[in-house]
Amino acid sequence: MSKLLMIGTGPVAIQLANICYLKSDYEIDMVGRASTSEKSKRLYQAYKKEKQFEVKIQNEAHQHLEGKFEINRLYKDVKNVKGEYETVVMACTADAYYDTLQQLSLETLQSVKHVILISPTFGSQMIVEQFMSKFSQDIEVISFSTYLGDTRIVDKEAPNHVLTTGVKKKLYMGSTHSNSTMCQRISALAEQLKIQLEVVESPLHAETRNSSLYVHPPLFMNDFSLKAIFEGTDVPVYVYKLFPEGPITMTLIREMRLMWKEMMAILQAFRVPSVNLLQFMVKENYPVRPETLDEGDIEHFEILPDILQEYLLYVRYTAILIDPFSQPDENGHYFDFSAVPFKQVYKNEQDVVQIPRMPSEDYYRTAMIQHIGKMLGIKTPMIDQFLTRYEASCQAYKDMHQDQQLSSQFNTNLFEGDKALVTKFLEINRTLS
Protein backbone atom coordinates (compact mmCIF):
# COMPACT_ATOMS: atom_id res chain seq x y z
CA MET A 1 0.00 0.00 0.00
CA SER A 2 1.37 3.43 -0.99
CA LYS A 3 1.81 6.00 1.75
CA LEU A 4 0.62 9.61 1.63
CA LEU A 5 1.76 12.41 3.93
CA MET A 6 -0.71 15.26 4.42
CA ILE A 7 1.19 18.35 5.58
CA GLY A 8 -1.25 20.45 7.59
CA THR A 9 -3.93 19.64 10.16
CA GLY A 10 -6.39 22.46 9.52
CA PRO A 11 -9.90 22.15 8.02
CA VAL A 12 -8.52 21.91 4.45
CA ALA A 13 -6.22 19.02 5.38
CA ILE A 14 -9.03 17.20 7.19
CA GLN A 15 -11.42 17.47 4.24
CA LEU A 16 -8.74 16.30 1.81
CA ALA A 17 -7.73 13.42 4.10
CA ASN A 18 -11.38 12.33 4.19
CA ILE A 19 -11.51 12.29 0.38
CA CYS A 20 -8.30 10.22 0.27
CA TYR A 21 -9.71 7.88 2.93
CA LEU A 22 -12.96 7.38 1.00
CA LYS A 23 -11.65 7.26 -2.55
CA SER A 24 -8.06 5.97 -2.52
CA ASP A 25 -6.06 3.04 -1.19
CA TYR A 26 -3.39 5.28 0.36
CA GLU A 27 -2.21 4.75 3.91
CA ILE A 28 -2.68 8.30 5.24
CA ASP A 29 -0.42 10.07 7.73
CA MET A 30 -0.85 13.71 8.74
CA VAL A 31 1.51 16.20 10.34
CA GLY A 32 0.92 19.53 12.07
CA ARG A 33 3.07 21.92 14.08
CA ALA A 34 1.85 21.31 17.61
CA SER A 35 5.02 22.63 19.25
CA THR A 36 4.65 26.11 17.72
CA SER A 37 0.90 26.52 17.12
CA GLU A 38 -1.82 26.41 19.77
CA LYS A 39 -4.42 25.54 17.12
CA SER A 40 -2.34 22.61 15.90
CA LYS A 41 -1.74 21.49 19.48
CA ARG A 42 -5.49 21.53 20.23
CA LEU A 43 -6.15 19.50 17.10
CA TYR A 44 -3.47 16.96 18.04
CA GLN A 45 -4.92 16.56 21.54
CA ALA A 46 -8.52 16.33 20.27
CA TYR A 47 -7.64 13.62 17.74
CA LYS A 48 -5.55 11.63 20.23
CA LYS A 49 -8.50 11.69 22.62
CA GLU A 50 -11.25 10.88 20.11
CA LYS A 51 -9.22 8.86 17.54
CA GLN A 52 -11.43 10.28 14.81
CA PHE A 53 -11.91 13.10 12.33
CA GLU A 54 -15.31 14.19 11.05
CA VAL A 55 -16.35 16.23 8.02
CA LYS A 56 -19.91 17.57 7.89
CA ILE A 57 -21.50 19.39 4.97
CA GLN A 58 -23.88 22.37 4.84
CA ASN A 59 -25.43 21.54 1.47
CA GLU A 60 -26.94 18.11 0.80
CA ALA A 61 -25.53 18.25 -2.74
CA HIS A 62 -22.06 17.78 -1.22
CA GLN A 63 -22.84 14.69 0.87
CA HIS A 64 -20.14 12.71 -0.98
CA LEU A 65 -17.57 14.90 0.86
CA GLU A 66 -18.74 14.06 4.40
CA GLY A 67 -17.66 11.26 6.67
CA LYS A 68 -15.98 10.07 9.85
CA PHE A 69 -12.55 8.51 9.57
CA GLU A 70 -9.26 7.75 11.25
CA ILE A 71 -5.78 7.90 9.78
CA ASN A 72 -2.73 5.69 10.12
CA ARG A 73 -0.67 8.21 12.09
CA LEU A 74 -0.79 11.83 13.24
CA TYR A 75 2.61 13.43 13.82
CA LYS A 76 3.01 16.33 16.23
CA ASP A 77 5.64 18.14 14.15
CA VAL A 78 7.36 17.85 10.77
CA LYS A 79 10.69 16.99 12.38
CA ASN A 80 9.08 13.85 13.86
CA VAL A 81 8.07 12.41 10.47
CA LYS A 82 9.79 9.10 9.71
CA GLY A 83 9.77 6.70 6.78
CA GLU A 84 9.06 6.81 3.07
CA TYR A 85 6.14 8.48 1.30
CA GLU A 86 5.23 8.24 -2.37
CA THR A 87 3.02 11.33 -2.25
CA VAL A 88 3.15 14.51 -0.19
CA VAL A 89 0.10 16.81 -0.15
CA MET A 90 0.84 20.39 0.90
CA ALA A 91 -2.35 21.45 2.70
CA CYS A 92 -0.63 24.38 4.44
CA THR A 93 -0.26 27.97 3.23
CA ALA A 94 2.03 28.61 0.24
CA ASP A 95 4.48 30.69 2.27
CA ALA A 96 5.18 27.61 4.43
CA TYR A 97 6.04 25.15 1.62
CA TYR A 98 9.81 25.62 1.60
CA ASP A 99 10.20 25.97 5.36
CA THR A 100 8.14 22.81 5.94
CA LEU A 101 9.76 20.62 3.28
CA GLN A 102 13.27 21.39 4.45
CA GLN A 103 12.41 20.02 7.91
CA LEU A 104 11.70 16.54 6.50
CA SER A 105 14.40 13.88 6.83
CA LEU A 106 16.66 12.94 3.93
CA GLU A 107 15.08 9.45 3.89
CA THR A 108 11.60 10.93 3.45
CA LEU A 109 12.62 13.52 0.85
CA GLN A 110 14.41 10.92 -1.29
CA SER A 111 11.34 8.66 -1.30
CA VAL A 112 8.85 11.25 -2.58
CA LYS A 113 7.63 10.92 -6.19
CA HIS A 114 4.72 13.40 -6.21
CA VAL A 115 4.17 16.71 -4.39
CA ILE A 116 0.66 18.14 -4.67
CA LEU A 117 0.16 21.85 -3.93
CA ILE A 118 -3.42 22.57 -2.82
CA SER A 119 -3.37 26.37 -2.38
CA PRO A 120 -0.23 27.53 -4.20
CA THR A 121 0.62 31.00 -5.35
CA PHE A 122 2.27 32.11 -8.57
CA GLY A 123 5.74 30.55 -8.50
CA SER A 124 5.09 27.87 -5.85
CA GLN A 125 5.86 25.02 -8.23
CA MET A 126 9.24 26.61 -9.07
CA ILE A 127 10.14 26.76 -5.37
CA VAL A 128 9.06 23.19 -4.60
CA GLU A 129 10.50 21.64 -7.77
CA GLN A 130 13.84 23.39 -7.34
CA PHE A 131 14.10 22.33 -3.69
CA MET A 132 13.03 18.72 -4.37
CA SER A 133 15.34 18.35 -7.39
CA LYS A 134 18.22 17.88 -4.93
CA PHE A 135 16.64 14.63 -3.78
CA SER A 136 14.91 13.33 -6.92
CA GLN A 137 15.61 14.18 -10.55
CA ASP A 138 12.15 13.05 -11.65
CA ILE A 139 9.95 14.67 -9.00
CA GLU A 140 6.40 15.46 -10.13
CA VAL A 141 4.90 18.70 -8.81
CA ILE A 142 1.17 19.26 -9.30
CA SER A 143 -0.42 22.65 -8.64
CA PHE A 144 -4.11 23.33 -8.18
CA SER A 145 -5.50 26.80 -8.81
CA THR A 146 -6.97 26.85 -5.32
CA TYR A 147 -8.60 24.65 -2.66
CA LEU A 148 -11.85 22.98 -3.74
CA GLY A 149 -14.20 24.92 -1.48
CA ASP A 150 -14.72 26.48 1.93
CA THR A 151 -14.13 24.31 5.01
CA ARG A 152 -14.04 25.62 8.56
CA ILE A 153 -13.94 24.65 12.22
CA VAL A 154 -17.30 25.23 13.91
CA ASP A 155 -16.20 24.73 17.52
CA LYS A 156 -12.58 25.57 18.36
CA GLU A 157 -12.73 23.11 21.27
CA ALA A 158 -13.38 20.31 18.74
CA PRO A 159 -11.04 21.16 15.84
CA ASN A 160 -11.13 17.55 14.56
CA HIS A 161 -14.73 18.20 13.45
CA VAL A 162 -15.04 20.47 10.40
CA LEU A 163 -17.81 21.79 8.16
CA THR A 164 -17.59 22.22 4.39
CA THR A 165 -19.93 25.09 3.55
CA GLY A 166 -19.35 25.38 -0.19
CA VAL A 167 -17.60 23.93 -3.23
CA LYS A 168 -15.98 25.96 -6.02
CA LYS A 169 -17.52 25.98 -9.48
CA LYS A 170 -14.28 25.06 -11.20
CA LEU A 171 -10.67 24.15 -10.40
CA TYR A 172 -7.55 24.06 -12.55
CA MET A 173 -4.67 21.62 -12.21
CA GLY A 174 -1.29 21.39 -13.93
CA SER A 175 1.65 18.99 -13.61
CA THR A 176 5.36 19.15 -14.40
CA HIS A 177 4.88 15.75 -16.10
CA SER A 178 2.94 15.45 -19.36
CA ASN A 179 0.53 12.49 -19.55
CA SER A 180 0.70 12.23 -15.78
CA THR A 181 -0.91 9.10 -14.33
CA MET A 182 -1.42 10.97 -11.05
CA CYS A 183 -3.33 13.73 -12.88
CA GLN A 184 -5.51 11.10 -14.56
CA ARG A 185 -6.29 9.58 -11.16
CA ILE A 186 -7.11 13.00 -9.67
CA SER A 187 -9.31 13.89 -12.68
CA ALA A 188 -11.28 10.65 -12.26
CA LEU A 189 -11.65 11.43 -8.56
CA ALA A 190 -12.90 14.98 -9.30
CA GLU A 191 -15.52 13.50 -11.62
CA GLN A 192 -16.72 11.17 -8.86
CA LEU A 193 -16.91 14.16 -6.51
CA LYS A 194 -18.81 16.22 -9.12
CA ILE A 195 -16.08 18.87 -9.16
CA GLN A 196 -15.32 20.53 -12.49
CA LEU A 197 -11.57 20.20 -12.98
CA GLU A 198 -9.67 21.45 -16.02
CA VAL A 199 -6.20 20.03 -16.59
CA VAL A 200 -3.89 22.72 -18.00
CA GLU A 201 -0.46 22.34 -19.52
CA SER A 202 1.67 23.44 -16.57
CA PRO A 203 1.52 24.09 -12.82
CA LEU A 204 2.32 27.75 -13.49
CA HIS A 205 -0.78 27.99 -15.71
CA ALA A 206 -2.94 26.53 -12.91
CA GLU A 207 -1.40 28.93 -10.36
CA THR A 208 -2.58 31.95 -12.40
CA ARG A 209 -6.24 30.87 -12.22
CA ASN A 210 -6.83 32.30 -8.76
CA SER A 211 -8.60 35.66 -8.61
CA SER A 212 -7.05 36.49 -5.20
CA LEU A 213 -3.73 37.13 -6.98
CA TYR A 214 -5.28 40.04 -8.87
CA VAL A 215 -7.86 41.47 -6.47
CA HIS A 216 -6.45 41.09 -2.95
CA PRO A 217 -3.43 43.42 -3.29
CA PRO A 218 -5.55 46.40 -4.46
CA LEU A 219 -8.30 45.63 -1.92
CA PHE A 220 -5.98 45.23 1.08
CA MET A 221 -2.88 47.26 0.22
CA ASN A 222 -4.37 50.74 0.00
CA ASP A 223 -4.29 53.44 2.69
CA PHE A 224 -7.93 52.97 3.71
CA SER A 225 -7.64 49.20 4.21
CA LEU A 226 -4.21 49.29 5.85
CA LYS A 227 -5.47 51.85 8.38
CA ALA A 228 -8.45 49.59 9.18
CA ILE A 229 -6.14 46.57 9.65
CA PHE A 230 -3.25 48.16 11.56
CA GLU A 231 -4.95 51.03 13.44
CA GLY A 232 -8.64 50.18 13.53
CA THR A 233 -11.60 52.46 12.77
CA ASP A 234 -14.28 54.24 14.82
CA VAL A 235 -17.06 52.39 13.01
CA PRO A 236 -16.91 49.07 11.12
CA VAL A 237 -15.72 49.18 7.50
CA TYR A 238 -16.03 46.41 4.95
CA VAL A 239 -13.69 44.85 2.38
CA TYR A 240 -16.06 44.77 -0.60
CA LYS A 241 -18.00 47.99 -0.08
CA LEU A 242 -17.67 51.31 -1.90
CA PHE A 243 -16.03 54.27 -0.18
CA PRO A 244 -16.73 55.48 2.53
CA GLU A 245 -18.17 52.16 3.81
CA GLY A 246 -15.20 50.33 2.28
CA PRO A 247 -12.08 50.92 0.18
CA ILE A 248 -13.51 50.65 -3.34
CA THR A 249 -12.98 53.81 -5.36
CA MET A 250 -12.11 54.44 -9.01
CA THR A 251 -8.48 54.80 -7.87
CA LEU A 252 -8.54 51.31 -6.33
CA ILE A 253 -10.09 49.92 -9.52
CA ARG A 254 -7.42 51.63 -11.64
CA GLU A 255 -4.73 50.07 -9.45
CA MET A 256 -6.40 46.66 -9.85
CA ARG A 257 -6.27 47.04 -13.63
CA LEU A 258 -2.62 48.18 -13.54
CA MET A 259 -1.55 45.20 -11.43
CA TRP A 260 -3.46 42.82 -13.70
CA LYS A 261 -1.65 44.27 -16.73
CA GLU A 262 1.73 43.81 -15.01
CA MET A 263 0.82 40.19 -14.27
CA MET A 264 -0.24 39.64 -17.89
CA ALA A 265 3.19 40.85 -19.06
CA ILE A 266 4.80 38.24 -16.80
CA LEU A 267 2.45 35.50 -18.07
CA GLN A 268 3.29 36.44 -21.65
CA ALA A 269 7.00 35.92 -20.91
CA PHE A 270 6.23 32.37 -19.77
CA ARG A 271 3.88 31.79 -22.73
CA VAL A 272 1.05 31.13 -20.27
CA PRO A 273 -2.43 32.06 -21.57
CA SER A 274 -3.67 35.42 -20.29
CA VAL A 275 -6.51 35.81 -17.78
CA ASN A 276 -9.66 37.68 -18.78
CA LEU A 277 -10.11 39.25 -15.34
CA LEU A 278 -13.75 40.31 -15.72
CA GLN A 279 -14.80 36.99 -17.23
CA PHE A 280 -12.99 35.09 -14.48
CA MET A 281 -14.74 37.16 -11.79
CA VAL A 282 -18.20 36.85 -13.32
CA LYS A 283 -18.16 33.30 -14.67
CA GLU A 284 -16.06 31.47 -12.09
CA ASN A 285 -16.31 33.49 -8.87
CA TYR A 286 -19.49 35.40 -8.09
CA PRO A 287 -21.97 35.75 -10.95
CA VAL A 288 -23.97 38.89 -11.66
CA ARG A 289 -27.42 39.20 -13.22
CA PRO A 290 -27.32 39.14 -17.06
CA GLU A 291 -28.93 42.59 -17.09
CA THR A 292 -25.88 44.08 -15.31
CA LEU A 293 -23.05 43.46 -17.78
CA ASP A 294 -23.09 42.94 -21.53
CA GLU A 295 -21.82 39.49 -22.61
CA GLY A 296 -19.78 41.07 -25.41
CA ASP A 297 -18.03 43.39 -22.95
CA ILE A 298 -17.23 40.44 -20.70
CA GLU A 299 -15.91 38.32 -23.56
CA HIS A 300 -13.79 41.07 -25.14
CA PHE A 301 -12.70 42.68 -21.86
CA GLU A 302 -8.97 42.21 -22.53
CA ILE A 303 -8.99 44.31 -25.71
CA LEU A 304 -11.22 47.15 -24.49
CA PRO A 305 -9.82 50.66 -23.73
CA ASP A 306 -8.38 51.14 -20.22
CA ILE A 307 -11.14 53.47 -19.04
CA LEU A 308 -13.86 51.05 -20.19
CA GLN A 309 -12.10 48.16 -18.43
CA GLU A 310 -12.09 50.20 -15.21
CA TYR A 311 -15.74 51.15 -15.63
CA LEU A 312 -16.74 47.49 -16.10
CA LEU A 313 -14.74 46.35 -13.07
CA TYR A 314 -16.39 49.08 -10.98
CA VAL A 315 -19.84 48.01 -12.20
CA ARG A 316 -19.02 44.43 -11.26
CA TYR A 317 -18.22 45.43 -7.67
CA THR A 318 -21.40 47.51 -7.40
CA ALA A 319 -23.37 44.51 -8.70
CA ILE A 320 -22.24 42.30 -5.81
CA LEU A 321 -22.77 44.81 -3.00
CA ILE A 322 -25.84 42.65 -2.44
CA ASP A 323 -26.30 39.04 -3.51
CA PRO A 324 -28.23 39.65 -6.74
CA PHE A 325 -29.62 36.09 -6.65
CA SER A 326 -30.93 36.23 -3.07
CA GLN A 327 -34.62 36.70 -2.26
CA PRO A 328 -35.51 40.25 -1.14
CA ASP A 329 -37.22 40.67 2.23
CA GLU A 330 -40.55 42.45 2.73
CA ASN A 331 -38.73 45.81 2.55
CA GLY A 332 -37.05 44.94 -0.75
CA HIS A 333 -33.63 44.42 0.83
CA TYR A 334 -31.36 41.73 -0.60
CA PHE A 335 -28.70 39.82 1.33
CA ASP A 336 -25.84 42.19 2.23
CA PHE A 337 -23.20 40.16 0.41
CA SER A 338 -20.39 42.72 0.68
CA ALA A 339 -20.53 43.20 4.47
CA VAL A 340 -17.24 41.38 5.10
CA PRO A 341 -15.50 43.31 7.90
CA PHE A 342 -11.74 43.88 7.90
CA LYS A 343 -9.88 41.77 10.43
CA GLN A 344 -7.45 43.79 12.54
CA VAL A 345 -4.05 42.86 13.94
CA TYR A 346 -4.61 40.66 16.99
CA LYS A 347 -2.80 38.87 19.80
CA ASN A 348 -2.58 35.09 19.67
CA GLU A 349 -2.67 32.72 22.66
CA GLN A 350 1.00 33.48 23.40
CA ASP A 351 0.30 37.26 23.46
CA VAL A 352 2.19 37.76 20.18
CA VAL A 353 0.69 40.32 17.78
CA GLN A 354 -0.26 38.74 14.44
CA ILE A 355 -1.27 40.22 11.09
CA PRO A 356 -4.44 38.60 9.65
CA ARG A 357 -3.98 36.16 6.74
CA MET A 358 -5.38 38.87 4.51
CA PRO A 359 -3.07 40.75 3.90
CA SER A 360 -0.06 38.81 5.30
CA GLU A 361 -0.49 35.94 2.80
CA ASP A 362 -1.11 38.48 0.05
CA TYR A 363 2.18 40.14 0.93
CA TYR A 364 3.96 36.84 0.29
CA ARG A 365 2.11 36.26 -2.99
CA THR A 366 2.77 39.77 -4.24
CA ALA A 367 6.43 39.73 -3.17
CA MET A 368 6.96 36.51 -5.15
CA ILE A 369 5.31 38.04 -8.24
CA GLN A 370 7.54 41.11 -7.89
CA HIS A 371 10.65 38.90 -7.64
CA ILE A 372 9.68 36.84 -10.70
CA GLY A 373 9.08 40.08 -12.65
CA LYS A 374 12.49 41.35 -11.56
CA MET A 375 14.17 38.11 -12.73
CA LEU A 376 12.48 38.53 -16.13
CA GLY A 377 13.39 42.20 -16.43
CA ILE A 378 9.70 43.21 -16.34
CA LYS A 379 8.89 46.47 -14.53
CA THR A 380 6.08 46.25 -11.96
CA PRO A 381 5.54 49.79 -10.59
CA MET A 382 2.01 49.10 -9.28
CA ILE A 383 3.05 45.90 -7.52
CA ASP A 384 6.06 47.76 -6.09
CA GLN A 385 3.74 50.42 -4.70
CA PHE A 386 1.45 47.87 -3.02
CA LEU A 387 4.43 46.29 -1.27
CA THR A 388 5.89 49.66 -0.25
CA ARG A 389 2.59 50.68 1.37
CA TYR A 390 2.25 47.40 3.22
CA GLU A 391 5.84 47.48 4.47
CA ALA A 392 5.41 51.10 5.62
CA SER A 393 2.33 50.07 7.66
CA CYS A 394 4.29 47.21 9.28
CA GLN A 395 7.15 49.56 10.14
CA ALA A 396 4.82 52.24 11.52
CA TYR A 397 3.15 49.65 13.76
CA LYS A 398 6.55 48.45 15.01
CA ASP A 399 7.59 52.04 15.77
CA MET A 400 4.35 52.77 17.65
CA HIS A 401 4.24 49.51 19.64
CA GLN A 402 7.78 48.82 20.76
CA ASP A 403 6.47 47.36 24.03
CA GLN A 404 4.56 44.59 22.24
CA GLN A 405 5.84 41.20 21.14
CA LEU A 406 5.37 41.09 17.36
CA SER A 407 5.33 38.07 15.05
CA SER A 408 7.94 37.68 12.30
CA GLN A 409 5.20 38.80 9.85
CA PHE A 410 6.17 42.39 10.69
CA ASN A 411 9.65 41.90 9.22
CA THR A 412 10.17 42.90 5.61
CA ASN A 413 13.24 40.88 4.63
CA LEU A 414 11.23 37.67 4.52
CA PHE A 415 11.12 34.92 1.87
CA GLU A 416 14.80 35.12 0.89
CA GLY A 417 15.02 31.32 0.69
CA ASP A 418 11.95 31.12 -1.56
CA LYS A 419 13.29 33.89 -3.79
CA ALA A 420 16.68 32.18 -4.10
CA LEU A 421 14.97 28.96 -5.25
CA VAL A 422 12.94 30.87 -7.86
CA THR A 423 16.12 32.56 -9.12
CA LYS A 424 17.90 29.20 -9.42
CA PHE A 425 14.92 27.61 -11.16
CA LEU A 426 14.72 30.42 -13.73
CA GLU A 427 18.46 30.29 -14.36
CA ILE A 428 18.31 26.54 -15.04
CA ASN A 429 15.03 26.43 -16.95
CA ARG A 430 15.33 28.83 -19.85
CA THR A 431 11.72 28.41 -20.88
CA LEU A 432 11.19 32.09 -21.55
CA SER A 433 10.62 33.69 -24.94
Swiss-Prot record:
This is Staphylopine synthase. Homodimer. It catalyses: staphylopine + NADP(+) + H2O = (2S)-2-amino-4-{[(1R)-1-carboxy-2-(1H-imidazol-4-yl)ethyl]amino}butanoate + pyruvate + NADPH + H(+). GO terms for molecular function: oxidoreductase activity. Keywords: NADP, Oxidoreductase. The keyword NADP applies. Induction: Up-regulated in metal-poor media. The keyword Flavoprotein does not apply. InterPro entries: Opine_metallophore_DH (IPR016935), Staphylopine_dehydrogenase (IPR053620). The active site is at residue 216. NADP(+) binds at residues 9-12, 33, 37-40, 99. Belongs to the staphylopine dehydrogenase family. Catalyzes the NADPH-dependent reductive condensation of pyruvate to the intermediate formed by the adjacently encoded enzyme CntL, namely (2S)-2-amino-4-{[(1R)-1-carboxy-2-(1H-imidazol-4-yl)ethyl]amino}butanoate, leading to the production of staphylopine. This is the last step in the biosynthesis of the metallophore staphylopine, which is involved in the acquisition of nickel, cobalt, zinc, copper, and iron, and thus enables bacterial growth inside the host, where metal access is limited. Therefore, this enzyme probably contributes to staphylococcal virulence. Coiled coil: none annotated. Pfam families: Staph_opine_DH. Its EC number is 1.5.1.52.
